[in-house]
Protein backbone atom coordinates (compact mmCIF):
# COMPACT_ATOMS: atom_id res chain seq x y z
CA UNK A 1 0.00 0.00 0.00
CA UNK A 2 0.88 3.63 -0.10
CA UNK A 3 2.40 5.50 2.79
CA UNK A 4 0.21 7.99 4.63
CA UNK A 5 3.00 10.52 4.53
CA UNK A 6 6.08 10.99 2.38
CA UNK A 7 9.00 12.96 3.72
CA UNK A 8 11.36 14.60 1.29
CA UNK A 9 14.79 13.62 2.64
CA UNK A 10 16.66 14.78 -0.43
CA UNK A 11 20.03 16.15 0.69
CA UNK A 12 19.59 14.92 4.27
CA UNK A 13 21.24 12.08 6.13
CA UNK A 14 19.37 9.46 8.13
CA UNK A 15 20.82 7.16 10.75
CA UNK A 16 19.47 4.91 13.48
CA UNK A 17 19.78 6.03 17.09
CA UNK A 18 22.98 5.14 18.90
CA UNK A 19 22.96 2.81 21.90
CA UNK A 20 25.63 4.01 24.30
CA UNK A 21 26.36 0.75 26.05
CA UNK A 22 28.92 2.10 28.51
CA UNK A 23 27.91 5.16 30.49
CA UNK A 24 28.22 6.28 34.08
CA UNK A 25 25.17 8.55 34.12
CA UNK A 26 23.81 6.91 37.30
CA UNK A 27 24.36 10.07 39.35
CA UNK A 28 24.00 12.68 36.59
CA UNK A 29 20.54 11.44 35.62
CA UNK A 30 19.23 12.54 39.03
CA UNK A 31 19.91 16.20 38.19
CA UNK A 32 20.10 16.14 34.37
CA UNK A 33 17.39 14.00 32.81
CA UNK A 34 18.51 15.30 29.40
CA UNK A 35 21.81 13.43 29.91
CA UNK A 36 23.74 16.17 28.19
CA UNK A 37 25.39 15.89 25.71
CA UNK A 38 24.30 12.39 24.63
CA UNK A 39 21.07 13.20 22.73
CA UNK A 40 22.85 15.87 20.68
CA UNK A 41 25.33 13.17 19.61
CA UNK A 42 22.59 10.83 18.37
CA UNK A 43 22.27 8.64 21.47
CA UNK A 44 18.77 7.26 21.90
CA UNK A 45 19.53 4.63 24.57
CA UNK A 46 22.02 4.82 27.45
CA UNK A 47 23.06 1.88 29.59
CA UNK A 48 23.99 2.90 33.13
CA UNK A 49 25.57 1.01 36.02
CA UNK A 50 28.66 -0.12 34.16
CA UNK A 51 31.81 -1.39 35.91
CA UNK A 52 29.81 -2.09 39.05
CA UNK A 53 29.81 1.53 40.23
CA UNK A 54 26.25 2.69 40.80
CA UNK A 55 24.47 4.90 43.32
CA UNK A 56 21.79 2.40 44.32
CA UNK A 57 21.30 0.70 46.60
CA UNK A 58 22.60 3.27 49.04
CA UNK A 59 21.70 4.05 52.63
CA UNK A 60 22.05 7.68 53.76
CA UNK A 61 25.05 6.70 55.91
CA UNK A 62 26.87 5.30 52.84
CA UNK A 63 26.30 8.20 50.43
CA UNK A 64 29.72 9.72 51.01
CA UNK A 65 31.45 6.38 50.34
CA UNK A 66 29.42 5.81 47.16
CA UNK A 67 30.21 9.33 45.92
CA UNK A 68 33.91 8.86 46.70
CA UNK A 69 33.88 5.66 44.61
CA UNK A 70 32.61 7.72 41.68
CA UNK A 71 35.31 10.35 42.16
CA UNK A 72 37.97 7.63 42.12
CA UNK A 73 36.66 5.70 39.13
CA UNK A 74 35.11 8.44 37.05
CA UNK A 75 37.08 11.50 38.06
CA UNK A 76 33.82 13.22 38.98
CA UNK A 77 33.92 16.22 41.27
CA UNK A 78 32.87 15.33 44.80
CA UNK A 79 31.39 18.81 45.22
CA UNK A 80 29.26 18.38 42.08
CA UNK A 81 28.05 14.98 43.29
CA UNK A 82 27.23 16.33 46.76
CA UNK A 83 25.25 19.23 45.33
CA UNK A 84 23.72 17.41 42.38
CA UNK A 85 22.54 13.96 43.40
CA UNK A 86 18.90 13.94 44.41
CA UNK A 87 18.79 11.09 46.93
CA UNK A 88 15.07 10.26 46.88
CA UNK A 89 15.73 6.52 46.86
CA UNK A 90 17.69 3.90 48.79
CA UNK A 91 16.99 0.54 47.14
CA UNK A 92 17.42 -0.39 43.50
CA UNK A 93 13.63 -0.80 43.06
CA UNK A 94 13.20 2.75 44.43
CA UNK A 95 15.92 4.05 42.07
CA UNK A 96 14.26 2.34 39.09
CA UNK A 97 10.88 3.82 40.12
CA UNK A 98 12.50 7.27 40.34
CA UNK A 99 13.85 6.84 36.80
CA UNK A 100 10.37 5.91 35.59
CA UNK A 101 8.72 8.88 37.35
CA UNK A 102 11.30 11.40 36.23
CA UNK A 103 11.79 10.20 32.67
CA UNK A 104 14.83 10.91 30.54
CA UNK A 105 15.62 12.33 27.13
CA UNK A 106 16.80 8.87 26.03
CA UNK A 107 15.83 5.30 26.83
CA UNK A 108 17.58 4.01 29.96
CA UNK A 109 18.69 0.49 30.84
CA UNK A 110 20.40 -0.07 34.19
CA UNK A 111 22.76 -2.67 35.59
CA UNK A 112 22.86 -3.53 39.29
CA UNK A 113 26.36 -2.62 40.43
CA UNK A 114 28.64 -4.88 42.43
CA UNK A 115 30.23 -2.06 44.43
CA UNK A 116 26.92 -0.64 45.64
CA UNK A 117 25.54 -4.08 46.50
CA UNK A 118 28.67 -4.80 48.56
CA UNK A 119 28.46 -1.43 50.28
CA UNK A 120 24.78 -1.98 51.12
CA UNK A 121 25.60 -5.33 52.72
CA UNK A 122 29.08 -4.69 54.15
CA UNK A 123 29.25 -0.92 54.72
CA UNK A 124 32.74 0.53 54.95
CA UNK A 125 34.22 -2.97 55.04
CA UNK A 126 33.16 -3.59 51.41
CA UNK A 127 36.48 -2.58 49.80
CA UNK A 128 38.60 -3.93 52.66
CA UNK A 129 37.83 -7.65 52.92
CA UNK A 130 36.23 -10.60 51.24
CA UNK A 131 32.51 -11.10 51.76
CA UNK A 132 31.32 -13.93 53.99
CA UNK A 133 29.06 -16.61 52.58
CA UNK A 134 26.06 -14.99 54.30
CA UNK A 135 26.97 -11.59 52.82
CA UNK A 136 27.25 -13.07 49.32
CA UNK A 137 23.81 -14.64 49.79
CA UNK A 138 22.36 -11.26 50.77
CA UNK A 139 23.97 -9.62 47.72
CA UNK A 140 22.46 -12.34 45.53
CA UNK A 141 19.05 -11.63 47.07
CA UNK A 142 19.44 -7.91 46.37
CA UNK A 143 20.50 -8.67 42.79
CA UNK A 144 17.38 -10.78 42.31
CA UNK A 145 15.30 -7.91 43.72
CA UNK A 146 17.01 -5.52 41.28
CA UNK A 147 16.29 -7.80 38.33
CA UNK A 148 12.64 -8.01 39.37
CA UNK A 149 12.57 -4.20 39.40
CA UNK A 150 13.90 -3.98 35.84
CA UNK A 151 17.70 -4.07 36.06
CA UNK A 152 19.16 -5.64 32.92
CA UNK A 153 21.96 -7.52 34.68
CA UNK A 154 24.88 -7.43 37.06
CA UNK A 155 27.96 -5.27 36.43
CA UNK A 156 31.35 -5.69 38.04
CA UNK A 157 35.03 -5.25 37.28
CA UNK A 158 38.32 -6.25 38.85
CA UNK A 159 38.48 -3.02 40.83
CA UNK A 160 39.67 -3.52 44.41
CA UNK A 161 36.65 -1.43 45.47
CA UNK A 162 34.46 -4.44 44.74
CA UNK A 163 36.17 -6.97 46.96
CA UNK A 164 39.38 -5.69 48.46
CA UNK A 165 41.55 -7.99 46.37
CA UNK A 166 40.78 -6.93 42.80
CA UNK A 167 39.92 -10.51 41.82
CA UNK A 168 36.79 -11.90 40.23
CA UNK A 169 36.36 -14.70 42.79
CA UNK A 170 33.62 -12.91 44.72
CA UNK A 171 31.61 -12.09 41.61
CA UNK A 172 32.06 -15.61 40.26
CA UNK A 173 30.61 -17.05 43.48
CA UNK A 174 27.31 -15.30 42.74
CA UNK A 175 26.64 -17.54 39.79
CA UNK A 176 27.44 -20.93 41.29
What kind of region is each of these model predictions?
Residues 25-29, 130-134, 170-175:
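Alpha-helix capping and helix-loop boundary segments enriched in small/acidic/polar residues
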Residues 149-176:
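Active-site core of metal-dependent hydrolases
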Residues 26-28, 53-56, 158-165:
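Active-site environment of divalent metal-dependent phosphoester hydrolases
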Residues 24, 113-115, 157-159:
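Active-site beta-loop-alpha junctions enriched in small/polar residues
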Residues 13-37:
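Di-metal (Zn2+ and/or Mg2+/Mn2+) metal-binding site signature of metallo-dependent hydrolases
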Residues 31-153:
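Divalent-metal coordination cores built from histidine and acidic residues
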Residues 7, 60-69, 168-173:
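Short low-complexity, flexible loop/linker segments enriched in glycine and/or proline
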Residues 1-17:
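Histidine-rich, glycine-flanked metal-binding segment
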Amino acid sequence: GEARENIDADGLALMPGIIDNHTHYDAQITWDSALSPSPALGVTTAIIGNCGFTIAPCRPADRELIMRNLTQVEGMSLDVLRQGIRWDFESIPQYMAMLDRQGAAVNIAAFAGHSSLRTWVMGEQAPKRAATSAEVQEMKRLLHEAMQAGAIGFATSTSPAHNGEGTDDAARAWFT
